[in-house]
Amino acid sequence: MYAVIKTGGKQYKVAIGEKLKVEQIPADVDSQIVLEEVLMIADGEQVVVGAPLVSGATVKATVVSHGRGEKIRIFKMRRRKHYQKHQGHRQNYTEIRIDAISK
C-alpha cells in the first residue's frame, strides 16, 4: 500500500515504514503529525485518485529529526563591471517516518 501526499509545495510517494526528508514542519521531535493532503492511494489493484484530494484520507507520520541540508553556493557576476557577489544557502528540513495510511 502506498500514497501520494503533498507537503511543502512538493509531492511524495510514501509507503508505511518509509523515512523521508520534507520541507520544515513546525512540530516537536517524536511527535505525531497528520498529513491530510492525500492526492492518491493505491492498495494492490485498487487505486483511488482524488480530484484534487482524496476525501477523508490521511497519512500519519512521526517526526524523527530536524536538520539543515547541504550548502548551495551562489555566485553572481556582471561582466566588465567588476561586480561579484557570493552567497550560500542551507535549506531546513524535517525527517519523518510514515506510520499509517488510512482511506
Curated annotation (Swiss-Prot):
Work out whether the entry's keyword set contains Calcium. no
GO cellular-component terms in the record? cytoplasm; ribonucleoprotein complex; ribosome
Q: From the UniProt record, list the coiled-coil ranges.
A: none
What keywords are assigned to this protein?
Ribonucleoprotein, Ribosomal protein, RNA-binding, rRNA-binding
Question: Does RNA-binding appear among the keywords?
Answer: yes
Question: GO MF terms on file?
Answer: rRNA binding; structural constituent of ribosome
Q: Which PROSITE patterns match?
A: RIBOSOMAL_L21 (PS01169)
Q: What is this protein called?
A: Large ribosomal subunit protein bL21
Gene name of the encoded protein: rplU
